[in-house]
Amino acid sequence: MRHYEIILLIHPDQSEQVPAMLERYKGLITAGGGKVHRVEDWGRRQLAYQINKLSKAHYLCVNIEAEQTVMGELEHAFKFNDAVLRHLTVQKKKAETGPSSMMKTVEREEARKAQQAEYAANNS
């Protein structure tokens, strides 16, 4: 089996359906004998350029281990799901289970904001 990293850009109006969509894709992967190593929900973010007249999208990052037949089914599901604006699949050499650089950036930003709030509360 091969390791893959999949990035999904989902229509911002469909953000509530992201967990159900993710479960459906996980079901496809596990039914084909694959494994899901990491799922990161990056949330709603600004796009670099407009896609279908939209300037924001809901981002998901999924690291999986699966056969090529399962990947074909997933690609087919992505293409025919109107909520998926774009998808990118990259083959990896090994399974990635730690936080991605995007999540590390988000965690650093949250820690910085918490530290500023604590500093402001102490100096008031």
Curated annotation (Swiss-Prot):
Family (UniProt): Belongs to the bacterial ribosomal protein bS6 family.
Report the Gene3D superfamilies cross-referenced here.
Answer: 3.30.70.60
Where in the sequence does UniProt note compositional bias of the Basic and acidic residues kind? Answer: 105-115
- What is this protein's name? Small ribosomal subunit protein bS6
UniProt-listed SUPFAM superfamilies: Ribosomal protein S6
* Molecular functions (GO terms): small ribosomal subunit rRNA binding; structural constituent of ribosome
Gene Ontology process terms (BP): translation
Q: Cross-referenced InterPro entries, in alphabetical order?
A: Ribosomal_bS6 (IPR000529), Ribosomal_bS6_CS (IPR020815), Ribosomal_bS6_sf (IPR035980), Ribosomal_S6_plastid/chlpt (IPR020814), Transl_elong_EF1B/ribsomal_bS6 (IPR014717)
Please provide one cellular component term from the Gene Ontology annotations of this protein.
cytosolic small ribosomal subunit
Q: Region entry Disordered: which residue ranges?
A: 93-124
**What the protein does?**
Binds together with bS18 to 16S ribosomal RNA.
Entry keywords, A to Z: Ribonucleoprotein, Ribosomal protein, RNA-binding, rRNA-binding
PROSITE patterns xref list? RIBOSOMAL_S6 (PS01048)
One Pfam family this sequence matches: Ribosomal_S6
UniProt lists the gene as rpsF
Species annotation:
Variovorax paradoxus (strain S110)
**NCBIfam families for the chain:** S6
